[in-house]
Amino acid sequence: MKKISLKSADQKIWFVSDLHLGHDKPFILGPRKYQNVNEAYTHTHEMLKMIGPDDILFNLGDMVIGAGANSMEYAKRIVYLPCKHQYFIWGNHNAGIQQMYDECRSEVGLLADDIEIYPLTYRNSNFTFLGHRAEIFIDGRAVILDHYPIASWNHIGKGAMHIHGHTHLNLQGDKRLLRIDASWEWKRRPVEWSEMLREVGDKKVFSPDHHCGVE
């Protein structure tokens, strides 16, 4: 895969994970302070307007729950956000987005279920599937992207950061580990690269269990 190397001076770079649009369970809605699925979608869509037409978004999985009509509508609205480019990492709730990926695979002649190709851009959009993990570079710094928090990563002792989502335990911050959680629970909005740099390694910043949220 072609190396993704970005300069923060050229555009804003945003991160988000675990939008869980369409998820109607109280253990997700409650901690996020939403009354219902529609309120969750309305607020999420409003917050995503922070991302401008010249900006880059990295979406770290679990965008929508299920593959029903409403979930697919939510998914396509996110896919077609008017930003310069959006890169997607697989999560663990993939039904809806998997359907869109399979459409892309069939269009390039990949019909076998066990064959994957990355990067792959969804039709007439700036939305690109990157796979299950990616290493990118921002201002020369390596950044490891994964839906799941991992214990060790490439260049871990040389300033490389790890940005993830999907936390089912409260992982306390550690200044020795440049790891930070982009899940929706943290800010209830996308988080921009400069803010990530300010907060990573702060022991007061932790990865919240997204079934419990942040007080």
Question: In which residue ranges do the predicted regions lie?
Answer:
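Acidic, histidine-bearing metal-coordination/catalytic regions of metal-dependent phosphoesterases
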Residues: 1-35, 186-215
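Core catalytic region of metal-dependent phosphoesterases/phosphodiesterases
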Residues: 7-10, 14-16, 21-130
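Conserved beta-sheet core of the metallophosphoesterase superfamily
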Residues: 105-215
